[in-house]
Regions:
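Conserved N-terminal phosphate-binding loop of PLP-dependent enzymes in the Aspartate aminotransferase
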Residues: 2-240
Length: 240
């Protein structure tokens, strides 16, 4: 069974509290390997070193990348339990790589991990940035264009809707309003992507409360501008 602890590129989909415990129970019962894709969630993004810790998952294998070097060098890897490693060691396993164990990428990853530890970056996310961002992010839920706010650690999403009461989808082609909102974000010097009509954000782990205030201010301004344009173009209609 392979999954992200929190689905990132799909729209920051945070599972309900009962989801992962049930997945873990089923995998344990039927001896199914549980593989956690930590490419996005790993290395502090959710407020712990790994998203599996945040969601209380016990994976047999974790895939890692991006945060391993903070994006400064292309590097990825797999982390396995002792049980999985023992199986791999017991048989001959031949596999060819064009590149592997590159010394520059490995050195950058080690230095990145040292900095994360010595500067307390993960502690900062867990104790300072994430709680403050969550409070401010959920406050955007009062905007007439926002039907739902979700956030865990430094991963947040806003669901855009033409009707806050029903949280209905737009009648327009999916992503039409999301694209308009994205463009207004860019115009206000805020990098916020859209997945359909859901806006997603993943700010730097070292962001400060003062910088979060700037982020939220720009997000609200972008939402205001998007709302005005959506009304002007007659797009504020719910799907039937």
């Amino acid at each position: 069974f392979i999954a992200e602890p929190v689905q990132g590129a799909g729209g920051v989909i945070i599972p309900p509290e009962t989801y992962w415990p049930e997945i873990q129970r089923i995998c344990d019962k039927y001896e199914i390997l549980l593989i956690a894709d930590e490419v996005i969630c790993g290395f502090g993004r959710t407020g712990n070193w790994f998203g599996s810790q945040t969601l209380n998952i016990r994976p047999d294998i974790m895939t890692i990348a991006k945060g391993l070097s903070s994006g400064y060098q292309p590097i990825g890897g797999s982390v396995v339990t002792d049980e999985v490693a023992a199986v791999l060691d017991s048989v001959e396993f031949n596999h060819g790589y064009t590149y592997s164990g590159h010394p520059v990428a490995a050195a950058v990853a080690l230095e990145n991990l040292r900095i994360l530890e010595e500067e307390g970056v993960i502690d900062h996310v867990r104790d300072v940035a994430a709680p403050y961002l969550a409070e401010k992010w959920h406050a955007l839920g009062d905007h007439p264009l926002v039907g739902d706010t979700r956030i865990v650690g430094m991963m947040g999403s806003l669901a855009l809707t033409p009707d806050k009461t029903t949280r209905a989808k737009f009648a327009s082609e999916p992503g039409t309003v999301g694209y308009i909102c994205r463009e207004r974000c860019f115009a206000n010097n805020l990098v916020m992507r859209h997945v359909g009509d859901r806006m997603i954000i993943s700010p730097p782990l070292v962001i400060t409360p003062a910088e979060i205030d700037i982020l939220i201010g720009r997000a609200r301004q972008a939402l205001d501008e998007c709302y005005a344009r959506v009304k002007e173009e007659g797009l504020l209609k719910a799907a039937s």
